[in-house]
Amino acid sequence: MTAFNPSSVRPGGLPTTIPEYLEHLRRSLAGADPALVQDALYDAEEYLRSELSENPGKSEADVIVSVAGSYGAPDEVADIYRDTEVKVQSALRAPAPKPRRSWMGHFFGVIAEPRTYGALFYMLLSLATGIFYFTWVVTGISLSAGLAVLIIGVPFVILYFGSIRVLSLVEGRIVETMLGERMPRRPLYSSRGQPLLKRIGELFIDPRIWATQLYFLFMLPLGIVYFTVVVTCLTVSLALIGTPVGLLLGFGSTLSIDDWNLGINGQPWIWPIAMLVGVLLLFVTLHIARGVGYLHALLAKHMLVKSAQYD
């Protein structure tokens, strides 16, 4: 990472190189969400390098000066991104639930929170995504290692590592949509001004690439656990709630669980107890989903966002 050098800043406060501009912008966004910082840096570098390529006769310093009025100085851009982020999050965020004072309100109020169902669906979806991610990484690593000694293996390895960045962005969008955690909306910028070999080398030494692959490998066991817990808890709770009603309506005569039978002519006093246990288990399942969603969002944020670059 390029260190900020005050001597490369013009008297007017504008940096003279694109890396210095990005470093200034990064420092201006200190304390902001790492995902927001990644998006801001990507947009700024994309814009500045596009302007530089369209004006080959200008230096980086001249380009920065020429776009200062339209795009803005680093401090101005940082303020714009902070303000925009507040507005966007306010528009996208679900209405905050009314504060609940009693423990019963906290316990049963989870059913009215949209994030509960987002986390629930994510836990169900994670089995499919976990299988896909795990298969993709294992296959990609195996083929990359096997083909690396061949000429055709080099472009395959590059393509595979590039696909990891794309899948990381896709998973981030899923996490933000379902779990509510702010994730990057832009990929990591691949500098077009660097030599090809250096850009290829950065793919292999980028710790976030390896962290993303590790995350994808984790997703298979996590997906199995998530899916199993949700399906089991929902099935048992809904069965306990619905079976007494079904028995009363004539749908069957007995519910058997191991050696325990809940039947029409058996012990009808157990019916309300079974329904109560089913309702409680259902709400416990919703709380588990909320907790798992919160923890998994933190895991995804830590492993998929290049936060170390912005500390």
Q: What does each of the following model-derived ranges do?
A:
Residues 3-6, 53, 57-122, 183-206:
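Cytosolic juxtamembrane regions of integral membrane proteins
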Residues 263-271, 283-311:
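Cytosolic/matrix-facing juxtamembrane and C-terminal tails of multi-pass cellular membrane proteins
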Residues 2-39, 50, 54-61:
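A composition-biased, non-transmembrane "mature-region" signal
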Residues 242-266:
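Membrane-interfacial helical/loop segments at transmembrane boundaries in membrane proteins
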